[in-house]
C-alpha cells in the first residue's frame, strides 16, 4: 500500500469526500485570487457592498425553508430499499419508488414558488437597505449588480431540490463532483468579470457559474433518471407531506431561519454603523475561516445520505463507528488549517504586508477560529441527529439566533469586530457546545434504545 493510500485511509477519504475536498481545496486556492481581485479592482466602499451582497443573499434561507435538506433525508430512507441499475435507474420495491416520485414532485412544486417569491421579495429589500448606506456622490452601479445577483440566486434555488434528491438517492460522489465543477467555473467567471471592469457584477458571476454547471448536468446527465422516477408516481402510494414531512420540515425551517442571524447579520450591521472598510475586513476574514470550516464539514456532510440509509436499516453500531471516526478526521484537518492561518496572518502583520490591513487582527481572528472549532462539533451532531428525520435542535437554534443577533447588533454597532468575535466565542463556549452536546447524547441514547 502506498503512502498516499495509507493517508487517505487514515483520513477516511472516499470518492465523495475526495471530490468534495478537491472542490474545497479549489475554493481555498481561488479565494486568495478572488480577494486580491476585490482589493485591486474595487474601491473600499464597493468592497463593503460586495461582502454585504453575500450576507443579504443569505436571506434565501427564508424561502428555502429547509425543504432541500428534508428531501435529501427522506430520499435516503426510501432509496435504502432500492438498487441502482447499470443504466442509471432505480429498481426494487415499487412502493418505495412511488414514494420517491411523490417526494420529487412535491419538492419541484414548492421550489417553483419559493424561487419566485425570493426574487420579488429580496430584490426590493436589498434596494431599500443599500440606498440607506449609499453616499450622496456615489454612483448607483450597485443596483444592476444587485438585481443580477438576486436573479441568479433565485434560479439556483429552483434547482436545489433536484440536486438534494439525487444526493439523497445515493449519488453523493456525483454531486460532489458537480460542486467541484461549479466552484471552478464560478471562480473563473468572477475573475474574468473583475478583469473586464465588471466590478460588482463579479458577485453574480460567481453564482452564474454554479447555475450553468448545474443546469447542463441535470439536462444532459440526469434528465432520464428524473423522468423515470416521476413515471413511477402512484396516487395510492405517496408521501403524505403534512403528516410525514411537515413535522420535520417546520423544525428545520426554524433552525435554518435562525442560522441567518447566527452567521449573516454582522456584516450589514458593520456596514451601517462602523467606518468604511470594517465590513470588508470582517468579510474577508470570515470568508477564509468559512472556507476552512466548509472543507472540514465535507467529511461529515457527505455522510448525511449514508447515515440515513444506515438508520433505515437499523445499523446503529455502524452508524456510530462511522460518525465518531469521521468527527476525529474532520477536527484534525481543521486544527491544521487554523494553525496555518494564524501563522500566515502573524507573518503578514510582522512584515507589514499591505494585505494584512485587509484582514482582522490576530486577536479577533483567533477568537473567530475558536468559534469555528466549536461550530464543527455542533454541525456534526446536527447531521447525525437530523439523519433520523428529526430536528431536536430547533429551540436551541432559536435561542442561539437571538443571542447571536443581539451580539451582532450591539457589539457590531458599539464595539466593532473584536467585540463581535469575543461575544461569538464566549457564546459558543458557555452555551453552544454544552447545550447541543447534551441534547445530542440524550437523543442518541433514547432513539437507539427505542429501536
What does each model-identified segment do?
Residues 1-13, 200-207, 216-263, 314-317, ...:
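Interhelical loop/hinge segments that connect adjacent transmembrane helices in multipass membrane
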Residues 12-77, 81, 250-277, 428:
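Signature of the first transmembrane helix
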Residues 14, 51, 87-113, 245-246, ...:
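Interfacial transmembrane-helix starts/ends
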Residues 53-65, 255, 259, 265, ...:
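Transmembrane helix-bundle signature of multi-pass secondary active exporters and lipid flippases
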Residues 65-93, 289, 293-314, 387:
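Helix-loop junctions and terminal segments of transmembrane helices
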Residues 127-148, 276-280, 317, 343-373:
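Interfacial segments at transmembrane-helix termini and the short loops linking adjacent helices
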Residues 143-148, 176-227, 403, 417-441:
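Hydrophobic alpha-helical transmembrane segments
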Residues 153-179, 201, 366, 370-397:
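Membrane-interface junctions at transmembrane-helix termini in multi-pass inner-membrane proteins
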